[in-house]
Regions:
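Glycine-rich, small/hydroxylated-residue low-complexity segments
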Residues: 1-225
Length: 225
C-alpha cells in the first residue's frame, strides 16, 4: 500500500519544442515511447506491466502563463500495446492492444484546477489471453466516437495523493468526469476444459448503441452512474 502501491515509469526518447512566434509553443513527442507500470497487488505480490505507446504525428500547442496554461493536443493515432505481465515472479503472456483514432482536445491548468476535454473518432481493441489453466479467450471490437471530459481541484502541499488520499480530500481534492461512447461492436471466442476435463469452446458477439457514464470524488464521498 501507500507510496509503494504503484509506479509508472515513462521513457520518452525525444521531445521537440518549437516557438510558433505568437506566444505559443508546439511540442512534438517521439512517435513511440515505453511505459513500465509496477507495484504491489492486493494479494501482496509484486507486479510489472510493460507497455508501448505509439503516437505518430502527435502535436501539442501550449499557450498562456505558467500559472494559467492551456494545451491543445492532436493525436492522429494513439495505440497502447501490452505483451506480458509479471506477478509474484511469474511471467504470463498478455497480448492486448487498444487504439484511439483522430483524438483532439484541450487541457487547462490554472490555480490548482485542471480541466480536460477530449474526443476520439474511433476506439479499437483486441486481445488473445491464455490463463494458467490453458483457458483461452480471444476478443476484438470497436466503438465509434469516444468523448471524455472532467475537472480536478488539487490542494497545495500534497505531493503523493495515493499515499495521502484522505488528507488530500480533507484539503479540497475534488474530481469529476464524464465519458460518452458511441455504437459498439465486439466478438469473442473461448476454449478450455469443462469440469469433467473435456474440451469446450464457444463464440459470441455484441452490438450496442453505446453508453454514457460519470463519476465524482470529493470529501463528501464518491459517486458514479
Amino acid at each position: 500500500g501507500g507510496a509503494e502501491a504503484s509506479r509508472v515509469a515513462v521513457d520518452v526518447p525525444q521531445i521537440a519544442l518549437s516557438d510558433m512566434g505568437d506566444g505559443k509553443v508546439k511540442t512534438v513527442f517521439a512517435d513511440q515511447m515505453t511505459l513500465d507500470m509496477s507495484g504491489t497487488n492486493p494479494d501482496g505480490d509484486d507486479y510489472q506491466l510493460p507497455a508501448t505507446l505509439d503516437m505518430p504525428g502527435n502535436s501539442m500547442i501550449s499557450s498562456g502563463a505558467p500559472e494559467d496554461m492551456t494545451h491543445e493536443f492532436s493525436y492522429p493515432t494513439l495505440k497502447v500495446t501490452l505483451t506480458k505481465v509479471t506477478s509474484g515472479g511469474k511471467e504470463t503472456a498478455l497480448p492486448l492492444n487498444f487504439t484511439l483514432l483522430d483524438s483532439t482536445g484541450t487541457a487547462h491548468l490554472a490555480a490548482g484546477k485542471y480541466d480536460y476535454d477530449m474526443s476520439s473518432a474511433k476506439l479499437t481493441f483486441e486481445g488473445d489471453v491464455t490463463d494458467e489453466n490453458q483457458e483461452n479467450v480471444k476478443f476484438a471490437g470497436s466503438a465509434d466516437t469516444l468523448h471524455t471530459k472532467g475537472t480536478m481541484s488539487m490542494p497545495a502541499g500534497v505531493v503523493d495523493m495515493e499515499a495521502h488520499l484522505g488528507a488530500a480530500l480533507r484539503n479540497g481534492l475534488a474530481m469529476d468526469g464524464t465519458m460518452q461512447v458511441g455504437p459498439t461492436a465486439a466478438t469473442f471466442q473461448f476454449s478450455g476444459k469443462d469440469e469433467n476435463g473435456q474440451d469446450t469452446s464457444g463464440a459470441g458477439q455484441y452490438d450496442g448503441k453505446g453508453f454514457a457514464a460519470s463519476s465524482t470524488l470529493a470529501q463528501a464521498g464518491m459517486g458514479y452512474q
